[in-house]
Each structure stands twice: as C-alpha cells, then as structure tokens.
Amino acid sequence: MKKAITLGVSIFLFCACVTSNVVKTDKSAIKKEVNTLLVNWHKAASDANFKEYFRVLDSTTVYIGTAAEEIWTKEQFANFSKPYFDKGKAWSFTTLERNIYMSESAKIVWFDELIDTWMGTCRGSGVLEKKEDSWKIKQYVLSVVIPNDDIQAVIDIKKKNDAIFLKRY
C-alpha cells in the first residue's frame, strides 16, 4: 500500500512540476517589443533608410494610403517610395499615442496610433505577425483624421474626385 501511495504522490508531483514549467506569454514584453519595432520603423522613414524600413514588412504586406487608389503590395509601395528615400527625405511620422492588442496565441498583434505628419494629425493602424523569431508588418493603413464638425467641408471637396474614382465601379 505504501508503494502505491508513494507512486501516486510521485506521479502527482511529476505532473505538477511539468505543468508549472509551461512558459507563459509575457504580453507586456511583446507589446514593448512591437512598440520598439514601430518606433524604429517610423524612424527609418525619417532617416530615409530604405533597407531598414522595408525589412520589417512581410513579403505579403499590404500598405493602404490615404487616397482611394492607394492599396499597395510591398513591392508596389517600395517602388512608389524609393524616389523619396533616394532623395534623403521620405516622411516623418511622430507617434502621439499608440494602443497595441494581441491574439491569445500572441502570434498576431494589431495596433492603432495617432501620429503627427506633414498632413497634420493622422491615424495609422496595422497588423503584425510573429514569424520565427521576428515580427513582420502584414498590413498598415494610414488615414487622415478629420474632426466631425469639419467633415461636410471635406465631403464637398472630395465630391469631384470621388465621382471620377467611382466611375471604375
């Protein structure tokens, strides 16, 4: 009987030790890592560092700009952007605030940010995926922020261009 009890206790303790060794996801460390990546990504544009800027974009990245027709693959966005980087001045986005969220698996992260740009205050949002040991930006969306009280004036300005764009559909 003592052997059965000892065996039972041993199995219980072994199982308890095995389950306590499970690595828990440190969400605050992941958020810090992603935040640093995004800060450095925006800095790479400010520094006109083409290689570093595009290094963190996944091969399947989609970059969505402020104009209706601006939906670019990584390659298309790189081709559009290269002349700006080559001149030594791409763009400068300064983060005002950023919120970072993540999936339960902590392999997918999404964020929103308010940024100060040459267009004034804008909103960026995006999705990152953990691939092997590094994060890759899968999608980034840049939107111009318009106060609700000013939206009618913007709608009036956009009508002509929207009509031209909508003829495609």
Locate each region found by the language model:
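Bacterial Sec-dependent N-terminal signal peptides
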Residues: 1-25
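Short, low-complexity N-terminal intrinsically disordered segments enriched in polar/charged residues
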Residues: 17-55, 149-151, 155-169
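A short gly/proline-enriched turn/hairpin at secondary-structure junctions
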Residues: 62-72, 84-90
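Short hydrophobic/aromatic-rich beta-strand segments that constitute the beta-sheet cores
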Residues: 63-65, 110-111, 137-139
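Solvent-exposed loop/turn segments at secondary-structure junctions
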Residues: 68-71, 115-118, 142-147
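Surface-exposed, charged secondary-structure patches
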Residues: 78-121
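Short beta-strand edge/turn micro-motifs at domain boundaries
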Residues: 121-152
